[in-house]
Amino acid sequence: MSDQLAIRKASQEDAGAITALINLAFAKVEQFFVDGDRISEAEVIASMQTGVFLVAERDGELEGCVYVEPQGQRAYFGLLSVNPHIQQRGAGSLLMDAAEEHGRKLGCAFMDIKIVNLRSELPDFYRKRGYVETGTSSFPPEVETKLPCHFIDMSKRLF
């Protein structure tokens, strides 16, 4: 057994494991304002057409993932997910570093993220990583929520 996490680009064969991991990671933290799964396998596969999932593995087991999508001079990252059983051990930070490095390699000057305003712990977490608030945006109207919510938009200069 290795203590090392390896980061790699996901392939379509990883879609099922990525879907399960994202839904597991988001289940408890989002259940107070939205029901159901966070993402479907079809949505993961569709996302792979416009961006990339970076995955963190240890001994062949998927322990985390993050989605990165280039958008001109900017890149977007989201769906940062870590297996709840290993959270607070650095996997999320390692994935964020990998996402930002991927953005730099693509020539993107900024990395953007959208966080749900109801997740009050997130703004400070991302501020500590160098992200600043740039505004707000609407939550997707097709997603039924238990509470009114919106996104807080944040951005970080990559170089």
Segments (PLM) and residue ranges:
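Acetyl-CoA-dependent GNAT
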Residues: K9-A15, T19-H85, M96-A98, H102, ...
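Conserved glycine-rich acetyl-CoA-binding loop
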Residues: E61, N83-D97, R104-L106, N117-P123, ...
